[in-house]
Structure formats: structure tokens, C-alpha cells
Amino acid sequence: KVFAMHNAVYPLSQEYQDIPRPDHSKEKIVTFLGRITMQKGPEYFVEAASLVLQRARNIRFVMAGSGDMMDAMINLAAERGIADRFHFPGFMKGKQVYEVYKNSDVFVMPSVSEPFGIAPLEAMQCGTPSIISKQSGCGEILDKVIKTDYWDIHAMADAIYSLCTNPALFQYLQEEGKKEVDGITWEKVGLR
């Protein structure tokens, strides 16, 4: 019998569990973290952010990572008049990645092509609700996320806005998403 074995995550170390989650009651943080390349769909994240900021200005956007589209994304944010709400901290690794997840209210992975994509699982482990593209492989095993087509910037913007303004939805996906990902371990995948 043949079956697909999806990726999983290791339980968070105590060091990463102990990273504090800041209070963002006044201002929300929405994050893209990954390679800033065409495959990852960063332009859709910037365009969705532009739509969100037409409805609410108490939201900041972070595009963490590096890649050949970095300069173009900085320019696109400036062209859309949202550069003051955008941060580009560059490449992250190790503990920095988990600090970014814990400091975020929403994680967005708008990938055009993504065989799996482990980042949403890592974000959800940290209690950060995630929005993923329907075209990502991890969407096959994740239910406690919001899924949109990568090209549908209006649906992505609506999802971001909803998570930033609806505490009940945020709390549900925060708690249930963490439970779901905590059950996707390498041990359980190996027992299949």
C-alpha cells in the first residue's frame, strides 16, 4: 500500500515556548516570513496589505526574509502608499524566526507553488493564526487555518482584516490551530 507522508514539526523547545507574546490590543502585526521570490507570492501579500490598510490603519505588516524580489516589494509598498506600515527586517534564522512568529497576530503564506510549506505549522505552534494559499501542500493536512487562492488579494485581505478585528475568530484559530499542529509530530507521521 502506498500513502503520502507529510511533513511534521518537533515540539517547541522550552526556550522557544518561553518567548513572550506581546500585547497587541492597540496595533496588530501581520507577517510574511520566507524567501522573497516569485514562488512565495510576496506581491500578493503587499497588495492584500494595501487593501486592509484602506479599512484599518492600526495594523503593521512585516515581510521577513530575503530574495530576488526584496527591492521590488519595498518599491511596491512605497507605490501603494503603505511603506510607513511595512517593515522589512531581512533574513531570519533560529530563535529569531520564533520571536517573529510570537510577535505576530497573523501569519500569511500566499505561495504560488508550495509542495508543503512548514512555516504555517511553526507559526501555529507559537499560537499565531495562519492564512495559507489553497495551492500549498500543507493545506492538505491543516484545517484550523484560513485558505485563500494566492491570487485572490480581496479574499486574503478579508481574512487578514477578520483575524485582526474579530477576537473570537482570532482566539478560535489561535487555540485550535495550536492543538492541531501539536498533533502533527514526526512520531505520529512515522506510525502511519
Give residue ranges: language-model regions:
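Carbohydrate-associated surface elements
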Residues: A8
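Conserved acidic donor-binding segment of nucleotide-sugar-dependent glycosyltransferases
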Residues: V145-H154, S162-P167
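Short alpha-helical donor nucleotide-sugar binding micro-motif in glycosyltransferases
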Residues: F91-M92, E99-S104
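A charged, aromatic-enriched C-terminal amphipathic alpha-helix characteristic of glycosyltransferases
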Residues: A168-R192
